[in-house]
Structure formats: C-alpha cells, structure tokens
C-alpha cells in the first residue's frame, strides 16, 4: 500500500511505522497488546479465530489489500499475508504497532485510529475489524467511516464478542461497550452494507464462559483483573488432554465456512459484508 496515495496525514519513524499526526483516546487497556503478545502464538483461541478468519477470506475473497483495523500485534495480519492475501496493519497502540512491525516483520504498519488517519474516500479495497467494534462507543459512526473509505462493493470482515448474556468482568476490563447478536449486527450494518454471511463460533465455550465468567459477574463475586498466568491456562498455552480435545472440537467448526453453513450459538460472531453501491 502506498500510504501517501490515500492520506497526507502521517509521519514515519525509524522502524518504518507510519504515525498519524494526532491520536484519539481508545477504549482498550494500555498494556493489552503486550499482554496478549505473550499468548497469541500459544493460544488455541487465537489460533482458531485465525483459522476461521482465513476460511472466510478464502470463501469471500477481497479484490485488493485488506486494511486490518485495530489489528493489535498483527497476529491476523501476519497470517493473511503468509496465506497470500496482502494486508496492512492499522493499530493505534504504540506497542502493538511496534510488535507488528519489528517482531512480526509486517511490511506495512500504521499507528493510528481510523478517524485520525483521515483516509481518502473509496481508497481501500477491503477492511477487517477483528474484535474491534465492541471497543467503540459510537460504533455506528465508526461503521460509516469504514464504509466511506471502502471502494464500491468493498469487503468487510468482522469478528465480535457475542451474546449479551455472556457479559462478564472480562468485557469490563477489556474496554467493551457491548456484545452482539444477529439483530444488533444487522441494525449496525444495514445502512451501508449487505451482510452476505453470518455465523457464530467457539460454540463449545458458551456454557463454560457463562458458568465461569458471566454468572459469577452477575452475582457480584468475580471482579478480578486477568493476569498472564490465568490467561495462559484459559487459552491452553500449556497444552494438555483437555486442550487437545477442545482443539479437535473447534477444528470441526471451521468446516462450516467451507460448506457455506452457519450456526446460531457461540461466544464470537463472524460477519462478512459487502459495501452497498
């Protein structure tokens, strides 16, 4: 991507990371990117989400580069590039942008919010927002801005935390404003996009998440902040029989996209939409 062809509002640092000239506040823990960088390559959750996203892109391919908006440490961006889909990391967190550029060797990294970068209209072929929109209070305005920068019939790939009844302390700590279902996604996108595929995944985690996270939060007995050791266990970073079983179950979910099928339960929602003309 030739950044100067789509915006003039940037500076470039010694690592080659592009920075916008100003930066808005974001609803995300300041240490979040470094926290998850320690887990991503070992986590069955991040692995399965990546596999799901990749199958979505394969089935509904873009017609150009994918702008990975709010892409954190570039975990998804790196996988897309490795699989032959050109992608650019757009991440407002300094540590995430650095991890993506220096540690994951991504060719194009922009440290900015979408709003602050002020991209030109219809300058982007496709966009991905993977667990991003829930961090934005005025998500309707954000979706409008994404539609503005996308080319006609440009593809939008989304993952979002699903089912408001799964709301827990993890959502609060992570800076989420909401979780989503079919209706809320449709209402959010209908003005600018046509939804061409929607499904839920991580189905086998729905009941455990409710019993271990959502229910204790509702009862007021779970307010602790997550730590690396806790997350290593929850993300299966240390392996084990149960983790292997979960991986097998989750791998079967990936066939849903290959077969064009969908399901109505799961802790995360995947959406593929196309910009309206």
Regions of interest found by a model, annotated:
Residues 193-204:
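Conserved S-adenosyl-L-methionine
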Residues 140-155:
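A short glycine-rich, Lys/Arg-flanked "PGG" loop and its adjoining helix->strand segment in the class I
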Residues 208-248:
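C-terminal helical/coil "lid" or tail adjacent to the Rossmann-like core of SAM-dependent
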Residues 130-133, 159:
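Residues lining the SAM
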Residues 136-140, 160:
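A structural helix-start
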Residues 1-122, 126-130, 140-143, 235-244, ...:
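Conserved N-terminal segment of class I S-adenosyl-L-methionine
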């Amino acid at each position: 991507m030739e950044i100067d062809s789509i915006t003039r509002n940037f500076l470039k640092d010694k690592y080659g990371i592009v920075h916008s000239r100003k930066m808005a506040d974001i609803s995300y823990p300041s240490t979040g990117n470094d926290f998850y960088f320690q887990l991503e390559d070992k986590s069955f959750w991040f692995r399965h989400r990546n596999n799901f996203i990749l199958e979505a892109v394969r089935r509904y391919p873009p017609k150009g580069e994918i702008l990975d908006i709010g892409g954190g440490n570039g975990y998804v961006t790196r996988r897309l590039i490795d699989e032959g889909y050109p992608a650019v990391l757009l991440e407002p967190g300094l540590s995430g942008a650095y991890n993506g550029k220096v540690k994951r060797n991504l060719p194009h990294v922009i440290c900015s919010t979408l709003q602050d970068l002020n991209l030109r209209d219809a300058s982007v072929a496709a966009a991905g927002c993977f667990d991003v929109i829930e961090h934005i209070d005025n998500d309707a305005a954000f979706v409008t801005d994404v539609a503005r920068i996308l080319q006609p019939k440009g593809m939008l790939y989304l993952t979002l935390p699903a089912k408001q009844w799964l709301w827990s302390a993890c959502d609060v700590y992570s800076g989420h404003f909401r979780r989503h279902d079919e209706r809320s996604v449709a209402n959010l996108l209908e003005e600018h996009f046509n939804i061409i595929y929607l499904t839920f995944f991580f189905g086998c985690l729905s009941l455990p998440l409710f019993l271990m996270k959502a229910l204790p939060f509702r009862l007021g007995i779970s307010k602790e902040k997550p730590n690396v050791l806790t997350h290593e266990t929850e993300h299966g970073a240390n392996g084990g029989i149960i983790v292997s079983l979960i991986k097998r179950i989750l791998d079967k979910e990936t066939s849903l996209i290959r077969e064009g099928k969908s399901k109505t339960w799961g802790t995360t929602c995947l959406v593929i939409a196309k910009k309206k003309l």
